[in-house]
Amino acid sequence: MNNDALKISNLYDLNETIAAKVFPSAYIAGPAIIGKDAEVRHCAFIRGKAIVGEGAVVGNSTELKNVILFNKVQVPHYNYVGDSILGFKAHMGAGSITSNVKSDKKLITIKGPDCNIDTGIKKIGAFLGDNVEVGCGSVLNPGTIVGRESNIYPLSSVRGFIPAGSIYKKQGEVVTKR
């Protein structure tokens, strides 16, 4: 038994089922915590520090790096999620990504509703509130914040702060949900 197995055996009764489903072709180069009933599907790639919540889905060819995925998050198809936090039941459509480095490599400023925060670092992805839906093929630029219960239309390039309960249709067109 290796040292990692010994550490796990100190935390869990190994006779009980720890019910995450990890496909044989998935690669996990943790440290990583994969929650109960989570699925890490075919060719998923998890590196850096990662917490994948209970019932979350990390799908086919999805890459995670330095992330927190709350319970029931779905990143099911060809996603990249780096240096990001995704709230409860957040869902990213196929091919949507969190960009975590600016193209000019400058430090990232997070733009809030009332102020800007200079982070002093070059890598930050996105922060999604609970029940956020991100459409297929969308890019969430570094430091993007999307408030809970919001929707991002497919093929969007999102930056800055999107208030809770909003629909992001395209740059400059954000409407309140009815």
Features from the language model and the residues they span:
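Glycine-rich hexapeptide-repeat left-handed beta-helix
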Residues: 60-61, 66-72, 76-178
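Transmembrane beta-barrel architecture of outer membranes
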Residues: 41, 47, 51-53, 59, ...
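Extended, small-residue-rich solenoid/repeat segments and analogous flexible loops
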Residues: 1-45, 49
